[in-house]
């Protein structure tokens, strides 16, 4: 293998012609989707019902409702837990925007909590100091497919009378002390979009073991109506509702993919463990951390650059160097990306405190008391946003250890040549490609 970086003209480490795209589709998917295609019912049909039932059984939930997105499922969780206008909800400072915009959907206020620098998850030791008199719930984001310390978080929630909502949108099959994500709080949301470990293109799942939470959240699913999917509709809006239903084709694809998910999960586990073992000791590379209590699903395998050892302290220099390293990894044939460049309090929708105009919902009398989005409160989240690189999809099934080894070679090649990474040169190379 050439040690000249591929971005400078060397041979890529990964033979991308051997990498199977995600999600893999076979006859099982074709048969299920064609069955839905030729059915006379495209909504409220058998596949929607069956997907919810099969997912609930697989994951260990009593109730599950298939939605059109993970964001929709998160909104349903909040409503099911009785969150309303002016309430406060704790959430990590680093995640996808939906983890916090879902709070705004029902006129509540996000209260951000900094992350643990090793797990990248909300720091449980910072939760209590963030609780305000208006706090009603904690959204625990099982980010990148890793579960947080749920015993500690649930104990805090019980002490303060708070609901616990799992954002498990990336955590299909991830475990906490042997229990699956989505069963560790009062309710949970999953996502099935293109990038997820379990994908049907787009979609989500609202799950809970609490009948009252299910009934409350389900009102949003279909225009505020209360009929279950298997019951006759009366077309009466009993509450403010959205249109969060999904269709039969997507549900059928989801069912087929779920039937293969244990294989997908085990493949990801094997590939992730292989990289952890065989990249140990790579210079200036910080590998992801898996606590003893957790079983990661490796939705994202996150690399971090050890800027402390490299003596790069300026944030802008860190970002430019990280972006150049990510570009070099991509040219080696690795699907590497910067998953989220901004921490949530940095995003305009939160920083401006003006979601709906006239400062709403922060302008609700008393709602903004104790709400501080100053970026200096979130040093760990800021630091992480500047130095991480995510590997997505390349490690997914059916790609096995042969591909994982090529990925390892590509990562080793780039990190053993960090002295040759010239951010300005790489920026110009990328610009020239766009011409």
Give the ranges of each region predicted by the language model:
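Basic phosphate/pyrophosphate-binding loop/patch that engages nucleotide-derived ligands
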Residues: 131, 155-163, 205-222, 320, ...
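Conserved small-domain helix->loop->beta segment predominantly found in fold-type I
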Residues: 232-245, 276-348, 426-434
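PLP-dependent aminotransferase-like
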Residues: 79, 83-168, 175
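Active-site region of PLP-dependent enzymes
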Residues: 171-177, 184-303
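PLP-dependent enzyme catalytic core of the Aspartate aminotransferase-like
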Residues: 1, 352-435
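Phosphate-binding glycine-rich loop
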Residues: 41-88, 102-104, 112-114, 179
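N-terminal "arm"/small-domain region of PLP-dependent enzymes with the aminotransferase-like
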Residues: 1-41, 391
């Amino acid at each position: 293998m050439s040690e000249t970086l591929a971005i400078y003209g060397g041979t890529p480490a990964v033979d991308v012609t051997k990498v199977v795209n995600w999600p893999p589709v076979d006859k099982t998917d074709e048969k299920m989707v064609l069955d839905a295609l030729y059915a006379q019912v495209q909504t409220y049909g058998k596949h929607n019902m069956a997907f919810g039932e099969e997912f609930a059984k697989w994951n260990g939930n009593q109730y599950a409702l298939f939605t059109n997105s993970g964001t929709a499922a998160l909104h349903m969780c909040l409503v099911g837990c009785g969150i309303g206008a002016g309430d406060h909800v704790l959430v990590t400072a680093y995640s996808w925007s939906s983890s916090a915009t879902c709070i705004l959907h029902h006129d509540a206020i996000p209260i951000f909590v900094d992350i643990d620098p090793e797990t990248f998850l909300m720091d449980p030791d910072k939760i209590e100091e963030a609780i305000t008199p208006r706090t009603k719930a904690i959204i625990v984001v099982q980010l990148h497919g890793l579960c947080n310390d749920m015993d500690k978080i649930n104990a805090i929630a019980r002490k303060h009378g708070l609901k616990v909502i799992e954002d498990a949108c990336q955590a299909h099959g991830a475990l906490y002390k042997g229990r699956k994500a989505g069963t560790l709080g009062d309710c949970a949301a999953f996502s099935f979009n293109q990038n997820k470990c379990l994908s049907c293109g787009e979609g989500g799942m609202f799950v809970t073991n609490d009948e009252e939470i299910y009934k409350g959240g389900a009102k949003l699913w279909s225009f505020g109506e209360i009929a279950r999917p298997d019951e006759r509709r009366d077309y009466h809006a009993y509450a403010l509702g959205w249109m969060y239903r999904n269709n039969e084709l997507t549900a059928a694809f989801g069912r087929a993919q779920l039937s293969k998910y244990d294989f997908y999960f085990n493949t990801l586990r094997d590939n992730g463990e292989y990289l952890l073992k065989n990249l140990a000791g790579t210079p200036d590379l910080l590998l992801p951390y898996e606590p003893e209590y957790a079983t990661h699903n490796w939705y994202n395998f996150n690399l971090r650059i050890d800027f402390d050892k490299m003596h790069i302290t300026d944030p802008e220099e860190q970002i430019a160097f990280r972006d150049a390293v990510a570009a070099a990894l991509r040219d080696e044939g690795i699907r590497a990306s910067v998953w989220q460049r901004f921490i949530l309090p940095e995003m305009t929708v939160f920083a401006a405190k003006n979601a709906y105009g006239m400062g709403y919902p922060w302008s609700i009398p008393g709602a903004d008391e104790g709400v501080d989005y100053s970026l200096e409160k979130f040093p760990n989240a800021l630091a992480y946003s500047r130095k991480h690189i995510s590997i997505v999809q390349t490690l997914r099934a059916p790609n096995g250890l042969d591909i994982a080894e090529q990925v390892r070679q590509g990562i080793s090649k780039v990190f053993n040549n960090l002295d040759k990474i010239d951010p300005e040169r790489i920026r110009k190379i990328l610009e020239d490609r766009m011409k």
